[in-house]
């Protein structure tokens, strides 16, 4: 199905220049999502930390208001998108900075393991480990453990929904709110839109979705 006619006119030029993700060339596609923002916010402090996961360590990025007092702030665990196979916290720096400024909160973004190198359940285990770390390090982070939200987009949205269930089932840290944005939830690829969006230059087409799910689920 031709999707160009359904794109807002002001976005047409950007869309026409985007090559589309090519999951048979992951190095290329991952490169599309690894560019740092042009300018960091002067109102938000960003800190890099390494925390433990099941296989060693992983990166988290902490975003907080510059000049904050020591009052405990609400917090959000942000899970970047990328179809479970791409992405890095750096791609959402601007978005996380906006969350901090809009909600006067602390945002923690986790660099979870990606498929196919690390298929399910690696990514969700990393997200859960980060959530537990936030609870355990609440004093250092200056956050209120009773006001911790989780959120993510695309594959990160799917992990957000999964994390809410995992935390519930494990009796883990309490979550006050979840925000899965256009989440990647259904591996069956039977919906009408799955058959409609097939063009190679589409941002995320049927072939990409099937390929990414196969990479993520592995032998599961």
Predicted stretch roles:
Residues 72-82:
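Short beta-strand element of the alpha/beta-hydrolase
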Residues 1-65:
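A glycine/proline-hinged amphipathic helix-loop "lid/cap" segment
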Residues 152, 156, 160:
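Gly/Ala-rich beta-loop-alpha elbow adjacent to hydrolase catalytic centers
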Residues 118-140:
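Alpha/beta-hydrolase active-site loop
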Residues 165, 169-220:
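Hydrolase active-site cap/lid region
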Residues 90-110:
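Short amphipathic alpha-helix adjacent to the substrate-entry channel of hydrolases
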Residues 150-152, 181:
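Short beta-strand immediately N-terminal to the catalytic nucleophile in serine-hydrolase-like folds
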Residues 135-150, 170:
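Gly/Ser-rich "nucleophile elbow"/oxyanion-hole loop immediately N-terminal to the catalytic nucleophile
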